[in-house]
């Protein structure tokens, strides 16, 4: 999963205990939060012992009583014990994002936006190497001029 920063919010889907949820990727949130109106009624929850800061005033704050199995947007295995409160959309916090291997990368300014789009369409993920297992060279190979005119491509 990759998302360019744009006017659209970065949202992705996760499957928690077999149920699909969509949430906002929030690197500023320590913990993941599920909207109270999306929390299944038969899933146990308890009053949270700590409040939530940064989302306004939430009168009812709960936490899952269980640690739940979660599959990330690219089927990354993870676990979460989310907070639950009245918010308009779910938030995927760093508790999940770290397990999913999320990265924030800023492309090298030497590459044009067009070349970055071409690479992204070809399946390149910033910060990952090229190749089947994304384990290839992670930085571009720089072309160097061979002043001695020796080596492949130069007459002896």
Curated annotation (Swiss-Prot):
Alphabetically, the GO molecular function entries are: aspartic-type endopeptidase activity; nucleic acid binding
Show the active-site residues.
26
G-patch domain sequence ranges: 111-156
Q: Cross-referenced Gene3D superfamilies, in alphabetical order? A: Acid Proteases (2.40.70.10)
| InterPro entries per the UniProt record, alphabetical | Aspartic_peptidase_AS, G_patch_dom, HERV-K_Pro_peptidase_A2, Peptidase_A2_cat, Peptidase_aspartic_dom_sf, Retropepsin-like_cat_dom, Retropepsins
| Record-stated family | Belongs to the peptidase A2 family. HERV class-II K(HML-2) subfamily.
Q: Which Pfam families match?
A: G-patch (PF01585), RVP (PF00077)
Q: Which organism is it from?
A: Homo sapiens (Human)
Q: Which reaction does it catalyse?
A: Processing at the authentic HIV-1 PR recognition site and release of the mature p17 matrix and the p24 capsid protein, as a result of the cleavage of the -SQNY-|-PIVQ- cleavage site
Which residue numbers delimit the Peptidase A2 domain? 21-96
GO biological process terms, alphabetically, are: proteolysis; viral translational frameshifting
UniProt protein name: Endogenous retrovirus group K member 6 Pro protein
Further notes on this entry? Two human-specific proviruses are inserted as tandem repeats with a shared LTR in most individuals tested. The telomeric copy is referred here as 'provirus 41574'. The centromeric copy is referred here as 'provirus 41575'.
How does it associate, per the subunit comment? Answer: Active as a homodimer.
The UniProt keywords, alphabetically, are: Aspartyl protease, Autocatalytic cleavage, ERV, Hydrolase, Protease, Transposable element
Please explain the role this protein plays, according to its UniProt record.
Retroviral proteases have roles in the processing of the primary translation products and the maturation of the viral particle. Endogenous Pro proteins may have kept, lost or modified their original function during evolution.
Give its E.C. classification number. 3.4.23.50
In what way is this protein post-translationally modified?
Autoproteolytically processed at the N-terminus. Expected C-terminal autoprocessing not detected. The sequence shown is that of the processed Pro protein.
| Top-level class of the enzyme under EC nomenclature | hydrolase
Record's PANTHER family? GAG RETROVIRAL POLYPROTEIN, RT1 CLASS I, LOCUS CE15
What the entry lists under PROSITE patterns is as follows: ASP_PROT_RETROV, ASP_PROTEASE, G_PATCH
């Amino acid at each position: 999963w990759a998302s360019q920063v744009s006017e659209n919010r970065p949202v992705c889907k996760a499957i928690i205990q077999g149920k699909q949820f969509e949430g906002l990727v929030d690197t500023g949130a320590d913990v993941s939060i599920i909207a109270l109106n999306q929390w299944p009624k038969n899933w146990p929850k308890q009053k949270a012992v700590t409040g939530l800061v940064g989302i306004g005033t939430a009168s009812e704050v709960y936490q899952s009583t269980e640690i739940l199995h979660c599959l990330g947007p690219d089927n990354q295995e993870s676990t979460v014990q989310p907070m639950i409160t009245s918010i308009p959309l779910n938030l995927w916090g760093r508790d999940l994002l770290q397990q999913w291997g999320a990265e924030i990368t800023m492309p090298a300014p030497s590459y044009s936006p067009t070349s970055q789009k071409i690479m992204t369409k070809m399946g390149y993920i910033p910060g990952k190497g090229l190749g089947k297992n994304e384990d290839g060279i992670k930085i571009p190979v720089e072309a160097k001029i061979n002043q001695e005119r020796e080596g492949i491509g130069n007459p002896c």
